[in-house]
Amino acid sequence: LPITPFIPPAAVSALPTGIWSGAAGLPVLPFMPGQSPAVTKAPKWSTEVVRTASGRERRTAYWPSPLWQFELQYEVIRHRPGADELAILWEIFNVSQGQYSAFLFVDPTDCQVASAAFGTGDGSTKTFQLQRQLGSFAEPVYAVFDPTVLESGSPAGAYTLEPNGQIVFAAAPAEGVALTWSGYFYFGCRFLEDELSAEQITAQLWAGKSLKFTSIRP
């Protein structure tokens, strides 16, 4: 069975010319009709805290940006000819070999950026990492769909979209040029468990438990 990616409706017209970055060969976790709207999502950081006898602390932050942990709930999963969602779900889990391989996930509530800053030209730098912003906080994005890149509000000159969300300009943007982009992005993820169970409730309907996974770095 093919694994069909969820593409935001506004992006459908751009599919024929879409460019993926850092996503070659990776399956996309599909959206299932029986998927519960209740989704758990949490940023996770890595911090070492050493407390002395006096109560003072020394804290060390090891990550420059968080990993995101997700948990999806499936209320009903169909398992019948023409609507075998259970087979599709097991397929992506087995293709990923549980925790081993990566896949892509789109969060319908957090998959689009508009005029996001990702750097300022200095006249010599050609390579820039695309980012997305949460208020004043910015973090890199690695799997990008059909980005529109601007230099100080005007269409950017020649560039290539490299793996892991990097933009490489043919000519370095001039000093002071503001670089922005708009488009869609996916989270690169892996499953948090090596087992995926489901419970049969009728002849052709199954109930799934939670599906847990975390974003990863390339």
Q: Residues of each region from the PLM?
A:
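Polar/acidic, low-complexity leader/linker segments enriched in S/T/G and N/D
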Residues: 1-45
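Short, conserved charged micro-motifs
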Residues: 79-88
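Surface-exposed ligand/attachment interfaces on beta-rich extracellular proteins
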Residues: 11-14, 18-26, 53-58, 115-126
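Oligomerization/assembly interface segments of phage tail-like spikes and tubes
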Residues: 1, 58-80, 197-218
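N-terminal ordered "arm"
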Residues: 27-74
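A surface-exposed beta-strand-loop module
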Residues: 156-177
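Extended beta-strand solenoid/passenger and fiber regions
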Residues: 87-160, 183-218
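Short, hydrophobic/aromatic-enriched beta-strand segments in well-ordered soluble domains
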Residues: 74, 177-185
